[in-house]
Amino acid sequence: MGDWLETDAQKFPHGLKGMVQEIHASGFQAGLWLAPFVCEKDSALFLQHPDWLLKVDGKPWCCGSNWSSFYALDIDNPAVLDYLRRVFDRVLNDWGFDLVKLDFLYGAAPFGNVHESRAARMYRAMELLRSWCGQKTILGCGVPVIPAFGLVDYCRVSCDVSLDWDDVWYMRLFHRERVSTKQAINNTVFRRQLNGRAYGSDPDVFFLREENCKLTAEQKRTLATVNALLGNVFLTSDMPSHYTDAQRAEYRRLRTLFEHATQVQTEAENDRLSIRYLLDGTPQKLCFDLF
């Protein structure tokens, strides 16, 4: 992360612009994942521009342990802003991407100072992103939900889902938040009021696959159904070409829910959640335990 203007010629022999053109020719929009406010310790940016890093007591601020660990960039540094402006110009206007998923955005504002609160700093960072992206679609991720209000098209409202139902205790030593399917569902439920008001809610991905996934069939169905009914983004990390006939049928069921369910209402009572909705004019109800 950090070296966003460099392209691997072996993986992308025709460049990213050529790949985007192929995607558009197939009738799809093209999206790209970026983490603009952080850089990895192994990146050229980290090694060549130590003055671009946000520092505490003279030391770069580490804000995540993924990969080689990553560090926050200082959005008060004009050189950082100029670099990021060039990154988005290249990605959106030269390469032609239609959507960017922007992750680890909290790195712009891990703390405030005497002149600016943390929330104000985060909001300023989000305004910068919108100014750089113009009318292109933004999916925000890893950002406090309030500073993103009205500045992104879609926003993650939950923690990351897990390949198991809940996280193991030692993962909390390495991550700022829980990686938990159970907790992600609760986040999606209790932040449902944001959907369509502050932005479109992204509840993270769902799984239908069997391989590399420890969720039971019931747990996978619950996660996917809640995402379809209460979210505005419908994504899976599965490889759909590997689906069985039964998994394809389940995907079609979920897609129908996502596109056609109406009058969705929720009610929580005694640790049990009920979701009522209409599908083709017929009342439907989903019940599950919250905790």
Question: Where do the language-model regions lie?
Answer:
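Aromatic-lined carbohydrate-binding/catalytic grooves of carbohydrate-active enzymes
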Residues: M1-D89, N93-G112
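Alpha-helix-loop-beta-strand connector modules within alpha/beta enzyme cores
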Residues: L16-I23, R118-K136
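Beta-sheet entry/capping signal
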Residues: G27-G31, D98-L99, Q135-T137, V233, ...
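Short secondary-structure transition/capping segments
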Residues: S43-L47, F111-H115, G150-V152, A249-E250
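Glycan-recognition surfaces
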Residues: L45-D82, R130-H242
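Active-site cleft segment of glycoside hydrolase catalytic domains centered on the general acid/base Glu
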Residues: A108-M122
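Carbohydrate-binding surface patches
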Residues: R221-L223, N227-L235, T266-F291
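Aromatic- and carboxylate-lined catalytic core of secreted/periplasmic carbohydrate-active enzymes
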Residues: A224-A268
